[in-house]
C-alpha cells in the first residue's frame, strides 16, 4: 500500500543519517511519535526551558549544555522565521536552525499527510547529515494525489 511505501521510504532516508546525529530538537513534543517510529532521540525545548513566562538563565544554561552534550546538529523550527527564542539558542549554542520548518500539530502546509511526511523527513534528513531522495518522495506524493482524485 501507499502508506507502507511511505514508511519504507522514510526508513531508507533515515538510514543515510549517521546514528550519532539522530536527535530531533524542536520546541514542542510533537515530534516524539515520529522519533519513536524511526529511531530518533527527540528533545522538546519546552521541557528544558519551561514556558516563556518562566524563562530563567539557569534553564537556558542547562539547555545550552544539553545541546552540546547531545552533539545536536540542528534545531528544527515549527515556523519561519524561527521564534526569537530558537534564534537566540541557535546563536548561543552554535547549533544551526534547519533551513525549513517542520510541520506539526495540524500546522499543515498546503497538502496532505504524505506531503507533510515527505517534507518533514527531507528537512530532518538533510539537516542531520543524511541525503534525502526528494524525487522518490515526490513520486509518493503523486501516488497520493491520484488516489484522492
Task: Give the positions of each predicted feature.
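Extracytoplasmic metal-acquisition and chelation regions
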Residues: 1-149
Amino acid at each position: 500500500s501507499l502508506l507502507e511505501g511511505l514508511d519504507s521510504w522514510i526508513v531508507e532516508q533515515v538510514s543515510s543519517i549517521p546514528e550519532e546525529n539522530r536527535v530531533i530538537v524542536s520546541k514542542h513534543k510533537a515530534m516524539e511519535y515520529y522519533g519513536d517510529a524511526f529511531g530518533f532521540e527527540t528533545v522538546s525545548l519546552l521541557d528544558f526551558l519551561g514556558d516563556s513566562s518562566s524563562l530563567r538563565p539557569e534553564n537556558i544554561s542547562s539547555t545550552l549544555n544539553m545541546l552540546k552534550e547531545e552533539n545536536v546538529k540542528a534545531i528544527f523550527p515549527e515556523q519561519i522565521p524561527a521564534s526569537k527564542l530558537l534564534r537566540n539558542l541557535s546563536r548561543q549554542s552554535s547549533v544551526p536552525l534547519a533551513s525549513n520548518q517542520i510541520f506539526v500539530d495540524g500546522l499543515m502546509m498546503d497538502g496532505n499527510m504524505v506531503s507533510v511526511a515527505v517534507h518533514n523527513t527531507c528537512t530532518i534528513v538533510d539537516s542531520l547529515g543524511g541525503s534525502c531522495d526528494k524525487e522518490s518522495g515526490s513520486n509518493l506524493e503523486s501516488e497520493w494525489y491520484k488516489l484522492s482524485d
